[in-house]
């Protein structure tokens, strides 16, 4: 229910296409963080990392507006929700806090990129360059982690 209201606001800020890109890319980055930094004997599933990514994008958007009353109010609200959710994530053993943090960090980058940066043509393509960079870093991390795991004597079949 919380994501429905928060997600609707974020979609209104960035539009449907960018919102979908933020959700999918940050979900991928969150899963990557879980895989790269998690123990070998665990498997993370769920959409909470992508939801944290949307939170991160909302925060990035409002960080640029922190000198306005509305921007500061939005940052306080989002910050409180994130803090509460992170306390829960770290406190409950079955919650994958690595995915939550990975999604949040990716969301901050995605939100900054989705709004655009630079001038002229660069600004026009900036959202997609930023999303592509997140995916590229995630893929590099997956390849690196998989290579490390394959080198372990317990996993010769990977």
Q: What label would you give each PLM region?
A:
Residues 53, 59-62, 71-79, 147-158:
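Contiguous hydrophobic segments
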Residues 12-13, 61-75, 115-128:
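Alpha-helical transmembrane bundle and helix-membrane interface signal
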Residues 27-28, 53-56, 78-86, 131-136:
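Small-residue-rich segments of transmembrane alpha-helices in multi-pass membrane proteins
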Residues 18-22, 72, 76-80, 102, ...:
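Alpha-helical transmembrane segments of integral membrane proteins
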């Amino acid at each position: 229910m919380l994501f429905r209201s928060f997600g609707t606001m974020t979609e209104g800020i960035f539009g449907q296409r960018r919102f979908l890109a933020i959700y999918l890319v940050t979900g991928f980055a969150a899963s990557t963080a879980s895989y790269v930094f998690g123990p070998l004997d665990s498997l993370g599933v769920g959409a909470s990392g992508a939801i944290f990514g949307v939170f991160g994008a909302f925060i990035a958007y409002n960080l640029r507006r922190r000198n306005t009353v509305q921007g500061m109010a939005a940052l306080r609200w989002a910050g409180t929700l994130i803090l509460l959710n992170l306390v829960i994530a770290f406190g409950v053993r079955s919650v994958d806090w690595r995915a939550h943090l990975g999604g949040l960090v990716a969301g901050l980058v995605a939100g900054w990129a989705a709004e655009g940066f630079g001038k002229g043509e660069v600004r026009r393509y900036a959202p997609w360059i930023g999303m592509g960079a997140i995916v590229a870093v995630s893929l590099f991390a997956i390849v690196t982690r998989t290579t490390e795991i394959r080198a372990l004597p317990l996993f010769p079949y990977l």
